Curated annotation (Swiss-Prot):
SMART domains: LIM. PANTHER family: LEUPAXIN (PTHR24214:SF62), PDZ AND LIM DOMAIN PROTEIN ZASP (PTHR24214). Keywords: LIM domain, Metal-binding, Repeat, Zinc. Residues 7-67, 68-127, 128-186 form the LIM zinc-binding domain. Gene3D superfamilies: Cysteine Rich Protein (2.10.110.10). Signal peptide: none annotated. This is LIM domain-containing protein DDB_G0271356.
Length: 186
């Protein structure tokens, strides 16, 4: 003879004759187990989740409490993450701080961990060529005050001859070969 036993609620020890919720290897009336954060019970059929700490959570509170948070939007990350400079991001939120370009592959950052694309990183540290607006990464550059140039882009503003390794004069923020400077400013 086959007999079917009626489960007993772990909380109230009464028989469960209708909906039985199994959580943590135990049977419950849905209204006798609730989310550890908001207290919501699961009598409406919503999902009961077990957190890594062994407590019951509704899906929202489980994510809010345990899912990694995006450094940019502060929301829980479900699925793929981008981890960089000790921080976690939604892949689409790992962006250059200046231009918001999504960063994939190579990226650059400053000492405080702020992500920048190559151009804006070199701009931030002062290594963009004034002429071409591209990063100076070869290690060779000409510095005039706080302005930097690739050696091949450091030329007289009037005759366009290269000024690398030769004397030059400055008028305002422009550089001239000695000959053109004398012609223009006597």
């Amino acid at each position: 003879m086959f007999t079917q036993s009626i489960p007993e609620c772990y909380s109230c020890k009464q028989p469960i004759t209708e909906i039985c919720l199994t959580a943590f290897g135990l049977q419950w009336h849905p209204h006798h187990i609730g989310c550890n954060v908001c207290g919501k019970d699961f009598s409406d059929g919503s999902r009961c989740e077990e957190g890594p700490d062994g407590f019951a959570y509704c899906s929202k509170d489980l994510l809010d409490k345990f899912a990694p948070k995006c450094q940019k939007c502060k929301q829980a990350i479900i699925g793929q993450t981008t981890n960089a400079v000790g921080k976690t991001y939604h892949p689409e939120h790992f962006q250059c701080e200046t231009c918001n370009m999504v960063l994939t592959g190579n990226f650059y950052h400053t000492d405080d961990g702020t992500p920048f694309c190559e151009k804006h990183y070199y701009e931030k540290i002062g290594f963009l060529c004034r002429h071409c607006d591209k990063p100076i990464i070869s290690g060779k550059c000409i510095t005039v005050g706080t302005t930097r140039f690739h050696p091949e882009h450091f030329f007289c503003q009037f005759c366009k001859s290269n000024l690398s390794g030769v004397g030059y004069k400055k008028q305002g923020d422009k550089c001239y070969c000695n000959e053109c400077f004398l012609k223009l400013y006597g």
